Amino acid sequence: MAIYAFDGTTCTPRNLSNVFRMYDAYKSRHKFYATGPGSRGTWLSKVIESMTGHGGKDRIYDAFEIWKYWQTRESRETIIIGFSRGAVIARELANKICEEDGKVDFLGLYDSVGSFGNPFNMIDIGYRKSIPSGVAYCAQALSIHEERFTFRVIRANLAKENTETTVQECWFPGVHSDVGGTLKKGLGAASLNWMFEQAINANTNQWDKEALDEAEKSVDCEEEPSENKISLPVCFLRSLRTRKIKEGDSRCCADNPQLATRTTS
């Protein structure tokens, strides 16, 4: 049993993101956690990492080497989770593991956003974002209120040859960091509680019951979403078109009136 967790940009355990909460709730001694890009080193290196996502490949390399080490000793349940850029890092790790004929039991993604290389890079060269066939179950929580241009969400699309993976995606009220669990805790608990449910549906069972109960009782779907942060003007431009819920997409906290206003066919 092993979990590999990749946090979002600038996130550390102090932020208590949903990724860290899941990592902390997983009952195993085989646990890997990586802070988000922009959380390490000097002030200047943090700024550069925050803008470019630099360091993502180092995190993948470290996790992959640990996976190989653990796999040589016994076959084990493999869970990978990530938030924001960490969710894109999680996808690439899943692809590397599946290339080695490994299996991923559960891939949990919170609002995947790339922009590796520069804030306007939507290609993310070197990062495979499609879900490979070696992943048994993939779940992604999506933010409906995020409007920043460089925060375009990456949907959980299957690789061309993949007809096996179960995929569940669900839209939540709140901006990017609300869904990731670092701002509004009531909205963050909604996506966390849903992700725990998806992980259990994927037949992973090493979760601390107290953490599951705490997530469930903390859900507040009526909490007001946070404002989109506008700091660095170039990095945080608002998009010309907000994210839209398409026909057939799942909505969590569907009774939230602000969620209903974002629906489109």
Question: Which ranges hold each PLM region?
Answer:
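Active-site- or binding-pocket-proximal scaffold segments within functional domains
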Residues: 1-265
